[in-house]
């Protein structure tokens, strides 16, 4: 076989095949074989001379090129070679400079680079071949690619905040209901289109990979989803902050239905790992339990308290980066996982007690296994207490560790850190900070208390007395002996203040004491949070008023300035842009801008289109498309077919008696009875979803009733499409993104004065789903924003509820006749043996109707009839739907976070400049090795990661001043100004929008 010659060798043209398959020269052709031999020889000589001359000419042409390449090669010396010409004070300084040089470049975003990174993660991170690569492994690879970019931004954000000595908020929450992260992260990074195109060439559809992700099992209900929205807004609004929580191995539980009853299964969300988390084995803290406290003398002869712990374990950090939208700022949630302090008890093992050694390890890890362990037993209660303490202790230790890096005295702690308690679960953080300041940092009580009360603030989320958390004094004394002493001291000093205000008033003293002694001894955690915090806030206007005047009125008398309102909000990036992309596109097109995603108030500019028939038509087409998507999901999950042209009526939320899912299902029974009697009704699909706490018997019984009603209704041939009842199991963020955009009506029907705020009402309204509800929580403010005519309000008002309860209890109230009919249907075994539902019947009969369902039932059915009539008028309904959406700008979590930042935390917006585009030539002058390409290729480099050591030595100027063009020195290595509009100065108060 003829040897293949290099096509790049001088003097040779690229060969090509002739028709017969033989190789010929690309320049000329020899004569045919029957030609004159002399002519052939002459021709060969001619070819030789041509080839020789051409080779000589190419060699001459290449000499300048080789010289240029040599010069370029000298310019592109690796950083180590370049650094050798600079003077350093030590080898360590030089090594640091070299490390910084390699860290400065950002990952490129061109199509080829995206594909290369994706394939690299498939091959090296997942160790898979092409034949092994499934949609799930492709999701993992893409997630790792995305995480790489989040880490770049997060590292630089941390460096930027550190350089600026900013104050940050530390948001402590036992729940972060994040949902899926891939789509949200790509959208925030602006890479959806680029990755969609890059993956299409590789045979993958981006939307299919989204569906491979499992929801993170880090929360349960509204509390956790609010925390997730807040983290999104912290990053988007450029506020310095950290979220702190726990890394649950099994989440709360995976809900399934067996014979209509809720069955809890472990939520194995971490079975295949999480591509988003960053395990921080370098960040761990010892956590201590039990033991005893004794008074000893320190080295100075001072009496101090010493806690000899009986059990120790470790809290190990896992970080989840949270990107901001249309900003380079990225924050993180730090989650703690419990580990044994020694991985294995070798002593026990060597004594032959292998099972004991294993048991000790598992006992440590159990603490963060499950969200909210069932506390119906003493063991469950103790596990929950240990879980909360591990959470707060690790968090406080971590915050203090960060603060010590500033080198500032502890008197300035509150100038660098604010701590927000999301409900009472993290309240043990108050005595924990006191313990560390007094016992470890040797501060006096007054110094420690001053620092603590300037640092903490507390958000209350409930007005229900039974929901206000309490801990048994004896249990805390056993598990946390040092902390019970501190809590007693806090209480004693606080009660002196009470005595000063109300001398000799023992009833006030008992009512305000942190220690409740009315029935045993319990620590009232909300009281501890109020006493130890500088600010207390409710989460809706009505709720905050109830907190001040009904729930904590005496505290409000003492500290009226401590109490504020911060109405909740939700992020429009997830709850419109991600969950309802067609609606987002319509809004953007109609506004000719997508700025509404970071300034939701401007969608009100669309109010004038509410009467526009073509806009209404497009709006309702989008709604119908979302209903089609939900109908497919229902058929797949529940095996029920529904008509998308009828009204979709939705109630999805955590199950609790005060939320009154029971009122809803009783109205469904009434509608079913109307159909059976031949009355004309508007067709409707009624959709339920939500979990009941494992130990909440009544909530689980209501779920059973709903499914029993659904079983009868959906299988009755006389009913057909007039009524369908659907219970969607395992309600979570990802299926909420399908359910919420499809609703025509959503139900928020809690007894007035019991719901703190609610956030699902905001999500439904933003997506054009009309609300039927009581004047409770945020419903009131939504009504004020969108107009009473665009909501369906019924029921007693909060100020009437106590009077209503009394007349029901006294037997002086006669319910609507339809109420008796519905209860009779249950008693007559219409939906199965009535005995199984007897406790439900008892809970709303005989003066026991605590949540006044019987009182509100009549007005509830009447407003449902109004909905049926309005839904028939398509233009009227479309206008209501549009108004419900475009007037909801107030309910963005961005607004809420800005209010917290300005009025509670005292933090400022710090928008980091982001990477700066520079050419390869400029990158070399900054001692940054460019990835590849010609001197004029553009790369993105990090200002924060440019070495302050090498750059100052190289240019006698700071990286910031040179890149921003601020350096006026005559330095030949100064790159051109290539900031392209980025805010290099990084001053506070530069909002994204």
Swiss-Prot record:
A Pfam family it matches: Phosphorylase
Q: What PROSITE patterns does this protein map onto?
A: PHOSPHORYLASE
Compositionally biased residues, Polar residues: 19-48, 962-981
Biological process (GO) annotations? glycogen catabolic process; response to ammonium ion; response to cAMP; response to differentiation-inducing factor 1
Post-translational modification note: The N-terminus is blocked. Enzyme activity requires processing of the 113 kDa peptide to an enzymatically active 106 kDa form of the protein. Processing would occur near the middle of the Gln-rich repetitive element.
Locate the compositionally biased regions of type Low complexity.
Answer: 58-77
Its EC top class is transferase
Q: Name one GO molecular function term.
A: identical protein binding
Q: Where is the composition biased (Gly residues)?
A: 983-993
Site (Involved in the association of subunits) at 229
- Enzyme Commission code(s) on record: 2.4.1.1
Is Hydrolase found in the keyword set?
Answer: no
UniProt keyword annotations, A-Z: Allosteric enzyme, Carbohydrate metabolism, Glycogen metabolism, Glycosyltransferase, Pyridoxal phosphate, Transferase
Q: Which InterPro entries match?
A: Glycg_phsphrylas (IPR011833), Glyco_trans_35 (IPR000811), Pyridoxal_P_attach_site (IPR035090)
Residues with the N6-(pyridoxal phosphate)lysine modification: 763
Q: Where is this site: May be involved in allosteric control?
A: 242
* Entry function: Phosphorylase is an important allosteric enzyme in carbohydrate metabolism. Enzymes from different sources differ in their regulatory mechanisms and in their natural substrates. However, all known phosphorylases share catalytic and structural properties.
Similarity-based family: Belongs to the glycogen phosphorylase family.
Q: What does the record's miscellaneous section state?
A: In D.discoideum glycogen phosphorylase exists as 2 developmentally regulated forms, GP1 and GP2, which are the products of separate genes.
Assembly and oligomerization:
Homodimer.
How is this protein named in the record? Answer: Glycogen phosphorylase 2
Origin species = Dictyostelium discoideum (Social amoeba)
């Amino acid at each position: 076989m003829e040897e293949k010659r290099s096509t790049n060798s001088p003097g040779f043209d690229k060969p090509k095949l002739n028709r017969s398959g033989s190789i010929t020269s690309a320049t000329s052709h020899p004569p045919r074989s029957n030609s004159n031999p002399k002519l052939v020889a002459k021709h060969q000589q001619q070819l030789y001379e041509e080839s020789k001359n051409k080779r000589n000419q190419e060699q001459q042409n290449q000499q300048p090129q080789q010289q240029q390449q040599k010069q370029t090669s000298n310019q592109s010396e690796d950083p180590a070679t370049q650094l050798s010409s600079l003077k350093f004070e030590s080898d360590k300084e030089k090594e640091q400079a070299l490390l910084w040089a390699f860290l400065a470049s950002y990952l490129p975003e061109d199509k080829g680079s995206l594909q290369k990174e994706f394939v690299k993660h498939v091959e090296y991170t997942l160790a898979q071949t092409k034949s092994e690569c499934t949609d799930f492994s492709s999701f993992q690879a893409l997630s790792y690619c995305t995480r790489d970019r989040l880490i770049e931004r997060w590292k630089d954000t941390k460096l930027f905040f550190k350089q600026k000595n900013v104050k940050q908020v530390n948001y402590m929450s036992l729940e972060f209901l994040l949902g899926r992260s891939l789509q949200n992260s790509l959208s925030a990074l602006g890479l959806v289109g680029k990755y969609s195109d890059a993956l299409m060439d590789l045979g993958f559809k981006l939307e299919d990979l989204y569906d491979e992700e499992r929801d993170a099992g880090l929360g349960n209900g509204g509390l956790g989803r609010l925390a997730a929205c807040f983290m999104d807004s912290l990053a988007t609004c450029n506020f310095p902050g950290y979220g702190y929580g726990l890394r649950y191995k099994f989440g709360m539980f995976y809900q399934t239905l067996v014979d209509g009853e809720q069955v809890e299964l472990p939520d194995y969300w971490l079975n295949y790992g999480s591509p988003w988390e960053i395990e921080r084995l370098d960040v761990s803290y010892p956590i201590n339990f039990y033991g005893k406290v004794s008074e000893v003398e320190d080295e100075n002869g001072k009496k101090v308290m010493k806690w000899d712990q009986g059990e120790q374990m470790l809290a190990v950090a896992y970080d989840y980066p949270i990107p901001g939208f249309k900003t380079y700022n990225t924050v993180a949630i730090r989650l703690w996982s419990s580990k044994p302090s020694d991985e294995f008890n070798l002593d026990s093992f060597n004594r032959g007690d292998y099972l004991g050694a294993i048991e000790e390890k598992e006992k440590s890890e159990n603490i963060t296994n499950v969200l909210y362990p069932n506390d119906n037993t003493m063991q469950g209660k103790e596990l929950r207490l240990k879980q909360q303490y591990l959470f707060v202790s690790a968090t406080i230790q971590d915050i203090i560790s960060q603060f010590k890096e500033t080198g500032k005295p502890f008197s300035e702690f509150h100038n660098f850190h604010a701590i927000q308690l999301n409900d009472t679960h993290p309240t043990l953080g108050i005595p924990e900070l006191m313990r560390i300041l007094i016992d470890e940092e040797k501060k006096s009580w007054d110094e420690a208390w001053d620092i603590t009360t300037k640092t903490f603030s507390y958000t209350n989320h409930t007005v229900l007395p039974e929901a206000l958390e309490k801990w048994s004094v004896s249990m805390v004394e056993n598990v946390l002996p040092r902390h019970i002493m501190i809590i007693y001291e806090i209480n004693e000093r606080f009660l002196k203040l009470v005595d000063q205000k109300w001398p000799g008033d023992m009833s006030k003293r008992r009512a305000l004491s942190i220690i409740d002694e009315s029935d045993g001894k319990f620590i009232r955690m909300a009281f501890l949070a109020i006493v130890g915090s500088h600010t207390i806030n409710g989460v809706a206007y009505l709720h905050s008023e109830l907190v001040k005047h009904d729930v904590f009125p005496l505290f409000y008398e003492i500290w009226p300035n401590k109490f504020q309102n911060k109405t909740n909000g939700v992020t429009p990036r997830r709850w419109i842009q991600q969950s309802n992309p067609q609606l987002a596109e319509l809004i953007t097109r109609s506004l000719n801008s997508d700025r509404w995603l970071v300034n939701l108030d401007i969608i009100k500019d669309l109010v004038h289109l509410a009467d526009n028939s073509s806009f209404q038509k497009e709006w309702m087409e989008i709604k119908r498309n979302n209903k089609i998507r939900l109908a497919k999901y229902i058929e797949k999950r529940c095996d029920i077919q529904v008509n998308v042209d009828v009204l979709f009526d939705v109630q999805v939320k955590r199950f609790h008696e005060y939320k009154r899912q029971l009122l809803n299902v009783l109205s469904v029974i009434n509608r079913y009875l109307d159909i059976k009697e031949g009355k004309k009704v508007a067709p409707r699909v009624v959709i339920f979803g939500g979990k009941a706490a494992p130990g909440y018997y009544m909530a689980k019984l209501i779920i059973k009733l709903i499914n029993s009603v659904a079983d009868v209704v959906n299988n009755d041939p006389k009913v057909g499409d007039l009524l369908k009842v659907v219970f969607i199991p395992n309600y979570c963020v990802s299926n909420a993104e399908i359910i919420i955009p499809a609703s025509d009506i959503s139900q928020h029907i809690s007894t007035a004065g019991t719901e703190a705020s609610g956030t699902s009402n905001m999500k439904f309204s933003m997506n054009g789903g009309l609300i039927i509800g009581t004047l409770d929580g945020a419903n009131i403010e939504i009504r004020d924003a969108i107009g009473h005519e665009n909501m369906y309000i019924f029921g007693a008002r909060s100020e009437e509820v106590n009077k209503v309860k009394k007349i029901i209890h006294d037997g002086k109230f006669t319910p609507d006749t339809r109420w008796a009919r519905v209860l009779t249907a249950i008693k007559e075994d219409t939906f199965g043996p009535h005995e199984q539902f007897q406790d439900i019947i008892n809970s709303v009969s005989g003066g026991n109707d605590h949540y006044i369902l019987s009182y509100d039932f009549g007005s509830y059915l009447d407003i449902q009839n109004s909905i049926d009539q309005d839904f028939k008028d398509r233009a009227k309904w479309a206008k209501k739907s549009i108004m419900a959406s475009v007037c909801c700008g107030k309910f963005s979590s961005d607004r809420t976070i800005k209010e917290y930042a300005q009025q509670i935390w005292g933090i400022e917006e710090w928008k980091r400049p982001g990477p700066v585009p520079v050419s390869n030539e400029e990158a070399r002058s900054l001692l940054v090795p460019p990835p590849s390409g010609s001197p004029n290729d553009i790369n993105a480099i990090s200002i924060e990661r440019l070495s302050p050591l090498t750059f100052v030595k190289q240019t006698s100027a700071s990286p910031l001043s040179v890149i921003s063009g601020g350096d006026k020195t005559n330095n030949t290595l100064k790159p051109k100004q290539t900031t392209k509009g980025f805010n290099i100065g990084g001053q506070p108060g530069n909002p994204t929008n």
